[in-house]
Amino acid sequence: MILKSFKSHFGKSKKNLFTFKELESLLNLRPFVNNKRLMVAGDAEYKWQGYSWQTDQNGWPTSSLKKILNEYSIYIADCGRANKKINQLCFELEKIFKRPVDCHIYFSFKKNMKGFGKHKDVSNNFIVLCQGKIKVEVWADKKIEKIMTPGDYVYIPAEIYHKITPITEKRLSCSFPVSHHKNDRSFDEREWLTL
């Protein structure tokens, strides 16, 4: 679908991996907005009380989500099966790396929002920009900087410092972290259920 090997850090993939309409659906499903899956950049802290029928008492209520959407960059973890295309890309990356892969969906709604800053991750990351534009800075042997547009991807190896800055009002990207545990063989089932 996207790649056979990683010869460069940046490349072009197919567009429309994930849309804001699909994100809207996830944000309205409580299991995707619990405090273990939905992560907010910065020091945001919100408290809320669940309602009578909730089985997951730690789901963000809509009123709190609306507040943070206008202030922070956010991501939702455990989205490797958010749609068929994401599931397929996880499968392809698992074949390449021989390790489990997940998808974290990152989004923001204003330029230059509070983000995750310059940081490094313990896992290899393959990031696909779905909508909007972002500035990507990678500090490997030398600093690499690029403006990404929808369909562009960047591969960032583990322990390499990087920073993502939204430069359009709306930004949506999918980050595919590869398990950093050498003996991790806990792969998700990638068969797509059809009815």
Where do the protein language model's features map onto the residues?
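Conserved beta-strand-loop-short alpha-helix elements that form
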Residues: 155
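Active-site region of the double-stranded beta-helix
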Residues: 36, 41-152, 160-195
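An N-terminal JmjN-like helical accessory module and its immediate linker preceding a catalytic domain
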Residues: 1-35
